[in-house]
Amino acid sequence: MLRVGRAVACVACNNLASKNMGVRFRMPLQKLHPLSRAIHHRYNASANAQRPPHCSAARHFTSMSRLPMRPPKPSPGGHGGWRYQQHRSFWMLRLASRLLKLRYIVLGSAVGGGYTAKKTYEEWKDMLPDMSAYNWVIPDFVWELSDQIDLDKLTKILPELEEIAKLLPELPDFDKIGENFTFLKSILFTAEAPGDTPVKAATEAPVTATPEASDKQFKKSSDKEKVDQLQEELLRTQMKYQRMLERLEKENKDLRKVVLQKDEKGIHQRKIKKSLIDMYSEVLDILSDFDSNYNTQDHLPRVVVVGDQSAGKTSVLEMIAQARIFPRGSGEMMTRSPVKVTLSEGPHHVAMFKDSSREFDLGKEEDLAALRHEIELRMRKSVKEGQTVSPETISLSVKGPGIQRMVLVDLPGVISTVTAGMAADTKETIFSISKNYMQNPNAIILCIQDGSVDAEADRHRPGQSNGPAGERTIFVLTKVDLAEKNLASPNRIQQIVEGKLFPMKALGYFAVVTGKGSAGESIDSIKDYEEDFFQNSRLLRDGMLKAHQVTTKNLSLAVSDCFWKMVRESVEQQADAFKASRFNLETEWKNNYPRLRELDRNELFEKAKNEILDEVISLSQVTPKHWEAILQKKLWERVSTHVIENIYLPAAQTMNSGTFNTTVDIKLKQWTDKQLPHKALEVAWETLQEEFARFMAEYKGKDQDDIFDKLKEAVKDESIKRHKWNERAMDSLRVIQHNALEDRSITDKPQWDAAIQFMEETLQARLKDTDSVINDMVGPDWKQRWMSWKNRSPEQHTRNETRNELERLLKLHEDHTAYLANDEVTTVRKNLEGRGVEVDPALIKDTWHQLYRRHFLQKALQHCNLCRRGFYYYQRHFVDSELECNDVVLFWRIQRMLLITANTLRQQLTNTEVRRLEKNVKEVLEDFGEDNERKVHLITGRRVQLAEDLKKVREIQEKLEAFIEALHKEK
């Protein structure tokens, strides 16, 4: 290229020299271009005349050096002209090299491009509409955002780039990934270079599309992708929760099984040493559930808290328990059922229900609220519909430091009138519950009396019902602070606590204060208030009350001492009573059931459960041959009438084989699409039920205990009720039956003979039924009349004459159609009238129907007999009008359909339905096992009740003996 450039420069110099333009001059040497300076010194003859000519070929060149310019040819104008032209050409070259430098080109392009961009921006700006008129649409606060938002503060809050880089995981090298993709793309294009390849076409296709079309297509595809993604996400979420639900149901079912299988004998738990009061409370819990004729559960000591509604019973009990554990209401009945509270000393202040493992921390207000709510729920749950109170006992244990050991029962408060919303018998029910507990001769009655009301105005004093001696009653006067303020005569309080006002004597008299009446008061504040009141009270200061008769602390100590004294005096006597009860029950069992084990209701249920499951398992032992035989037989019994009456007989009335086959195909198709699959599944379901019942009946005969009959019958009925046949079975069965009925090719002679035999048996059965109907219509013949002394009725005589006349008509016209013409009916009626027989046309047609049916069946049997040797003609497709056996082919198709259907149903039964039925039986047994009421209803009898009583009495006696032993050790 340098040579070409030099040639261009020489041509330019020659042109300039030829025109004799310019003046000879020399520029300073120090300002020459280095290349020009080198050329100037090298080829200046006057300065260096002795230097030999330069040989460019011998010089070493590098990529950074410039090639030397060739010396121009000498001009014919002499030495001076040549020198002038040489200097002129170097000046022009220097000027061109300065002007054509790259930085000037780039700078000029940038200036021009910026100017063009500015013009374009101004043009676009002028094209936009003026939106200043719509500034009112934007709220004012938008314009003030820049003043309210402190960007510097926000930037300081945001983390630095180094901190974010520490938090982020190591990112991949995107530069390397880009280089790899570029390299892969170059390989693909290189490999596909010879022609218009698919890769090239795929890469160039988007370029040919218009931007508008591509934007629309991209928008459509993006919206569709979003919808698809949302649907997939919804399905994934639904499947996720479905799996979670199935897992929870499975876990719940497994836990139910564990609970059902858990009993005291099966799972050996570690024995935990229980306290004395816990052992005694456990005996009382068992007694509360034990309902026997001996009524011994009421003879063990306990403290019964009785009194009027809102007298402060619950408050006194809470002060003894040192926690606000009961739900409260202003004047409303809150205690709706008896609550047995077992108090004992422990390191932590906690409460727990008998049938629950949850501990309520009484030091936390949240647990206290939850405990009160749980007690209220249990009370409302125990109350039956239409009632206000319930006799069912709620068992609760409270442990804590400084709590006296005893068992208290809080009873519903006695009311004087029944208010709105209460049951009509609420007053009597409450009195009955209180009386039932107080009749226990060993019960300690804690009688609560409101001290703020007049003693004579008290509605009920249940403690008086136990006799004037009051040897089991402890009298408690509450709200003494209000009584001191309201009563003008303090001596009345002294008379009450000394037992002089009421006509009874009690074990002790106490006066307590249970707060100021606020529901939010804590136990500690109530205690402080009570102590402050009695310290400053005039009643105690003046000697009207003794120090040991005041405060709930003294009350709890006295009640506890009295309770344990009563327990020590009576518990051994009660243990002897239970021992006698056990002896009586065991004697009754030995005399009535000497060879039977003592199984209670739960044990009997487990035994019956195993027997039922064994009976269900026996269904899987039924042979396939037996299943298919009974299925085929029952299915044909169900569909035979439809096949004969609606398919075969109408098609047989046609005159040629083509019409016969067409009619048969149409009716078979309609039958298969609508009725046949339903009938087949009904038959299969009934067969499964019958086999299940048959196996249970057979198992029952083998020394079966009849006590399980009601349970087994209920399990069978409920399992069959829950069982639903597989929905997909009908569709597959319809296709199989349709394909079986479409086949007309009888391949061998045995199949042909089997079809003929099937047809003969079917037609003979129909002929027998028809003869029976005709005999009933016409009455007994002469032989039966003479031998059996039977006569015909007038109607039978008329039908007999009609039959004779119609038989003569059939003999004359053997190929008669199935229906009589009107003129034929008239002719028969006229002939009968000529013999003195009056007959109705409807009777003639009815008789004709049965006679023609018998005539047709007889002809069909004769034709069937002729077709025995027709298999050869059928196989060779001979056309013989006298031997067309299309009806044999029809019965072969029906028979084959029955065989295939029976086989299919048998597979569904053995592979699926028997297992599903077994699963249903297990679920029903599990549900029955959880329902105690249903078990009581299904497993009944004196034997069961006697075993239940024996088990309970033994358990009570064992626990009482263990309690007595621990009580003696404590002494």
From Swiss-Prot:
GO terms for molecular function: cardiolipin binding; GTP binding; GTPase activity; GTPase-dependent fusogenic activity; membrane bending activity; metal ion binding; microtubule binding; phosphatidic acid binding. Residues 307-314 are annotated as: G1 motif. Mg(2+) binds at T314, T335, D410. Residues 219-265, 906-971 form a coiled coil. Residues 116-781, 793-971 are mitochondrial intermembrane. Residues 747-867 are annotated as: Paddle region. Oligomeric complex consisting of membrane-bound and soluble forms of OPA1. This is Dynamin-like GTPase OPA1, mitochondrial. The lineage of its organism: Eukaryota, Metazoa, Chordata, Craniata, Vertebrata.
